[in-house]
């Protein structure tokens, strides 16, 4: 795909398709991003132009649609990213739930990506429980994402050294992870309160239920 230029009309059609179908909004003049993200995918699919890709997508090729969304989804994430939201979760939200004697609180990570955010949330809950005599012991976290590739990574809960080095303290690594095959896996006590679901936020979300706290930091 790098062998040709994307026309303005082709880019606009692809831009509109992504926004309408899954809520991904590309900025203006991001042809280079489309080229870099889709190059290998289109080569393997024997697609040589963006117009050809759109023909396939409009024809209802669901496998190709999933692959395109996976390729175009931004997956930059880290453990306890920006710190403050997790401090607020710990010191404000969980304290409030504890004061109201809520043991079955529900949380939602609306775009969980490869799992770092949702497992960070679960670690905070686990640590809070250890300080508060098992308060919130029946709490659950729903983790959703539009990318099946990212959901599979998150479900596995297995991360390499380089991934663990992004925002995870040595103490939390020791407490919440265990060696697994060629990497490290989140321990069951943290994994067990999390359930995963593929979800397009452009579609109906009322059926997901009500939540005491929603993290949607990876959505924007």
Placement of each model-derived feature along the sequence:
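Alpha-helical elements of the RecA-like P-loop NTPase motor core of helicases
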Residues: 87, 119, 152
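Conserved AdoMet
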Residues: 1-108
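Conserved class I S-adenosyl-L-methionine
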Residues: 102-120, 140-142
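Short, well-ordered alpha-helices that flank and scaffold nucleotide-derived cofactor binding pockets
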Residues: 91, 95, 123-130, 156
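Conserved SAM-binding loop of SAM-dependent methyltransferases across substrates and taxa
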Residues: 114-134
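Extended basic-aromatic, gly/pro-enriched interface segments that bind polyanionic ligands
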Residues: 110, 132-215, 219-220
């Amino acid at each position: 795909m790098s062998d040709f230029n994307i026309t303005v009309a082709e880019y606009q059609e692809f831009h509109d398709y992504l926004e309408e179908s899954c809520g991904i909004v590309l900025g203006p003049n991001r042809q280079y991003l489309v080229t870099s993200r889709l190059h290998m995918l289109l080569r393997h699919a024997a697609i040589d132009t963006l117009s050809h890709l759109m023909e396939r997508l409009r024809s209802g090729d669901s496998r190709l649609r999933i692959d395109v969304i996976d390729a175009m989804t931004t997956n930059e994430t880290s453990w306890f990213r920006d710190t403050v939201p997790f401090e607020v979760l710990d010191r404000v939200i969980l304290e409030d739930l504890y004061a109201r004697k809520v043991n079955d609180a529900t949380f939602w990570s609306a775009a969980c990506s490869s799992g770092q955010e949702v497992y960070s949330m679960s670690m905070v809950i686990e640590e809070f429980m250890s300080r508060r005599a098992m308060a919130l012991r029946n709490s659950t976290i729903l983790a959703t994402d539009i990318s099946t590739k990212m959901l599979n990574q998150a479900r596995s809960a297995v991360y390499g050294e380089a991934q663990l080095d992004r925002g995870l303290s040595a103490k939390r690594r020791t407490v919440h992870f265990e060696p697994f095959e060629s990497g490290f896996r989140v321990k069951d006590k943290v994994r067990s309160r999390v359930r995963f679901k593929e979800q397009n936020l452009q579609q109906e979300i009322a059926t997901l239920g009500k939540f005491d706290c929603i993290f949607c930091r990876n959505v924007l």
